[in-house]
Amino acid sequence: MATSGFKHLVVVKFKEDTKVDEILKGLENLVSQIDTVKSFEWGEDKESHDMLRQGFTHAFSMTFENKDGYVAFTSHPLHVEFSAAFTAVIDKIVLLDFPVAAVKSSVVATP
């Protein structure tokens, strides 16, 4: 099966008093400055039952052209600096990094 890029998926539960808006702005700023990030999406869970959510509230997804692009991102000085601040406000986290097996192309939002 052919792959279509490399994905970095992060699901988090922030600590109680975290200023999530500041973290989101920092993350958006970070990905805009590192060229190897080809796409970035994030969302806050609004629909899952608490029992199923297990406390996790936010998901972040980045796509890279390949694993080398991801490795360049993780070692970039801006990412290293941001990671320290991000880690400090995390209560729980799940990370998945994998080659993408694209079955259907992206959904285009309608106005």
From Swiss-Prot:
The role this protein plays is:
Involved in stress response.
Tell me what this protein is called. Stress-response A/B barrel domain-containing protein At5g22580
Could you describe the subunit structure of this protein? Answer: Homodimer.
Q: Which SUPFAM superfamilies match?
A: Dimeric alpha+beta barrel
UniProt-recorded Gene Ontology molecular function terms: metal ion binding
Q: Which UniProt keywords apply?
A: Magnesium, Metal-binding, Stress response
Q: Where does Mg(2+) bind?
A: 31, 34-35, 37
Q: Which cofactor does it need?
A: Mg(2+)
Output the superkingdom of the source species.
Eukaryota
Domain named Stress-response A/B barrel: residues: 6-98
Asked if the Swiss-Prot or TrEMBL record annotates the protein with the keyword Cell membrane, the reply is no
Recorded GO CC terms: chloroplast; cytosol; plastid
InterPro entries per the UniProt record, alphabetical? Dabb, Dimeric_a/b-barrel, HS1/DABB1-like
